[in-house]
Design a protein with these regions (language model features):
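Secondary-structure transition/capping motifs at alpha-helix termini
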Residues: 9-16, 46-49, 90, 166-173, ...
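Glycine-rich phosphate-binding/hydrolytic loop that grips phosphoryl groups
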Residues: 35-44, 153, 203-230
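Short beta-alpha connecting loops at secondary-structure transitions
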Residues: 15-31, 64-68, 200-206
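Active-site proximal loops enriched in glycine and acidic residues that flank catalytic Cys/His/Asp
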Residues: 10, 24, 151, 155, ...
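A contiguous, well-structured pocket-lining segment that forms one wall/lid of small-molecule binding clefts
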Residues: 41, 49-54, 59-64, 68-173, ...
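Conserved phosphate-binding/catalytic loops in two-lobed NTP-binding clefts
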Residues: 173-175, 185, 191-215
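Flexible glycine/proline-rich, aromatic-decorated loop/lid segments
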Residues: 1-20, 29, 33, 37, ...
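Short beta-strand-to-turn element immediately C-terminal to the catalytic PLP-Schiff-base lysine
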Residues: 7-10, 85, 223
Length: 230
């Protein structure tokens, strides 16, 4: 399951060039309403245990160990779910993105984000490693507001670092941001500010939603672009 991607190119001609580190997601689509699954998966992926895990019967862990119904994902939304479950102690949601919305509402000010490792893999895709965030997210010695602010700032910084890495190879001047996570104004505002400071022209959706509601429009535009190029 893709997500958190950076695509290079133009309509009808895109190449996937950057992403987030992947992890196995126990329960697949269930994770959208059960953020604890994403939080647990991040810990397990790093060989750690999560003290607040609500999976008392061990079924989710057993499924994760065996790979049963555990699709591999790099979805940024699931990363936000995990952060909400850990910081806000919010294991279950009434609707998708409820946890990230709560996490956004906790933030009070912009801070300097953590630097996350960014490496180019053998398949020529830059991958941002979220693992350094885990210790901070679960550190109760840091007040909840500060942790929420650090998380948002770190993801915004990671977006900017991906853009700079790709621009160094491809001379990029324009960046378009889309996807449900950019409904989060804290993330969007910080990402735009960092990208503009780095010299990019940045675009956010205005006429259409930036989330899945505009997927069909984007698919139609992509098909039209490809047909025009033929």
């Amino acid at each position: 399951l893709w997500g958190g991607e950076a695509l290079l190119g133009r309509p009808g001609c895109w190449v996937r060039r950057a992403s987030l580190r992947t992890f196995r997601l126990p329960g697949g689509e269930k994770a959208g309403r059960e953020p604890w699954r994403s939080a647990a998966a991040l810990h397990w992926e790093c060989g750690l245990e999560w003290a607040a895990l609500p999976d008392t019967d061990g079924l989710a862990r057993a499924a994760w160990d065996s790979g049963l119904n555990c699709p591999v994902t790099s979805a940024a939304g699931r990363l936000f779910d995990a952060a909400a479950a850990i910081i806000c102690e919010f294991p279950n949601a009434s609707f998708e993105a409820q946890g990230p919305m709560m996490l956004e509402s906790v933030c009070r000010s912009a801070v300097d984000g953590m630097e996350l490792p960014l490496r180019e893999s053998d398949d020529e895709i830059f991958r941002t490693d979220w693992q350094p965030l885990l210790g901070m997210l679960a550190d109760h010695a840091i007040e909840r507001v500060r942790r929420a602010e650090l998380f948002h700032a770190s993801i915004a910084r990671a977006i900017a670092e991906q853009a700079k890495a790709l621009s160094a190879q491809n001379d990029i001047a324009q960046i378009g941001l889309c996807g449900g996570v950019f409904q989060n104004r804290v993330l969007a505002d910080q990402a735009v500010a960092l990208l503009e400071d780095a010299g990019f022209s940045v675009y956010l959706p205005l006429a259409l939603p930036c989330n899945d509601a505009a997927l069909s429009y984007g698919q139609a535009a992509e098909i039209a672009a490809r047909e025009t190029q033929q």
